[in-house]
């Protein structure tokens, strides 16, 4: 059995290794939850044996050493981290400790914020001008990232307003919105560059580039949450008051900061943020709870590495470790072959996960994944679980290579990978049962033809029994034929037939989206429908004409043109129309006759809207004569940016396109 000294040494060595990977290399190997568990284990042992605590123990400092490639900045006021709690019981215990330490009847008000998952930085302003910026580093010394921080548009180079202190050091988090993260990885996959595991790594990698020109191309943003140095000036005596003052001086502050008058209100805030988490547009891993009164903060003081007056209340872990038992290959509706990892089941963010996507062959190669490997699994919001990285330091000896198929695992047709594309595809087309199933599932989905009650299991049976080969065959189904399916009684069968009859009345945009043309999503389908007005006009359009539609470039135009050039596709469309599928004749909207600031403009929505849904906003804009596109290009006239807008906003600013916020959009919609 190991001695206590050996256990402590092993834990410290392991934690230092993972701190180095996380803070210095921006390449964490284990989930945060596993790091937290190891740290708790070390802290508990040291609490029982305080005589064995060493000055260099991970419990006695904040982070890891800075990279030698950057010059260093010593923090005049140390940048401490926060202690964590992981459940309501632990938070209530923290709340009681605070009340007991204050030893007074004075009321405690809590200031609650989002715990952003990015990179902590300090920014020093002298006479209102940004003079330096640094990472947290080890809490005492950080890396000089001034040149890179100056490229972040959210951070003012000069504060504005009155009574700005002579020296003011603000602290906050640089992070990357999810839309920007996806765009960076999409570009990297296309060009063979580095693909990041998550937005936090991407933000850290972007901020710590030696070439600021690379940082400038990344859509980083920033929220401030505190102060370090303060000289030659005053700030309000509450935490919220300081944040509001920062905002007046032009510094970005999250609009989700909330005052809570009791522990019950704090818990309600925590659960509301947890509920809203998937729609925020950026990653958070909990909430931060601070005493609002600066006087009470000073009274409570600090422990070795954290303040006594604040705590991070973390959400259930979104990353866990498990083993890959096998890799199987699925076939999508366009023939895309997607590798899927079959996992030893593990609970991630409250959900039992047994499968995770591996995207494509390049991703398997990037990960260096082998069957039998120990891996980190991530699940964020409604996103399909994915493998973040392989824990190479714990690779078993009996792992096996993942072999990508050369023939379709469903129909046996050749698998083809077009040069320049990451995705390999089955060449079988509709002779492939898997493609047929997925195409039909897409056709009946809610945002396409919206056939109520026609679920995946019904489609699977219809294809397997050879009842349905094309979408048009769906409308030939009878209640009698459907009754023969598993768990389908006469009443349910008649309901499906009625739903199919109802679905025949649709819109041109929904019909186009339902056809499943490659690269044609809802926004593009709506744009094509609005531009051409009729199916006949769209079918006859050339590639050049198609590119005149907002959000349609050469790739999408080619896919659309090729789809309608294929005789089998035209035959299916003819059959659908013959079965009674129809939509209203186009209403020609003359932008010149509409009295609206949006009339005739190509508009792009980005970020999260708080006052109305994105669908409602799109519908309202179209009513007022706008064309709503899905991406920013030189054809774009206006970008409406909600909270945490990402790469689309950055591109709009780069192209000099007019940008307004949600409040201005609502004002114009009402004008």
From Swiss-Prot:
Domain of life: Bacteria
SUPFAM superfamilies: BRCT domain (SSF52113), DNA ligase/mRNA capping enzyme, catalytic domain (SSF56091), Nucleic acid-binding proteins (SSF50249), RuvA domain 2-like (SSF47781)
Enzyme Commission number: 6.5.1.2
Keywords, in A-Z order: DNA damage, DNA repair, DNA replication, Ligase, Magnesium, Manganese, Metal-binding, NAD, Zinc
PROSITE patterns: BRCT, DNA_LIGASE_N1, DNA_LIGASE_N2
Disulphide bonds in the chain: none
InterPro entries named in the record: BRCT_dom, BRCT_dom_sf, DisA/LigA_HHH, DNA_ligase, DNA_ligase_AS, DNA_ligase_CS, DNAligase_adenylation, DNAligase_N
PANTHER family per UniProt: CHROMOSOME TRANSMISSION FIDELITY FACTOR 18 (PTHR23389), DNA LIGASE (PTHR23389:SF9)
Protein role: DNA ligase that catalyzes the formation of phosphodiester linkages between 5'-phosphoryl and 3'-hydroxyl groups in double-stranded DNA using NAD as a coenzyme and as the energy source for the reaction. It is essential for DNA replication and repair of damaged DNA.
The protein's name: DNA ligase
Higher taxonomy: Bacteria, Pseudomonadati, Pseudomonadota, Gammaproteobacteria, Enterobacterales
Annotated gene: ligA
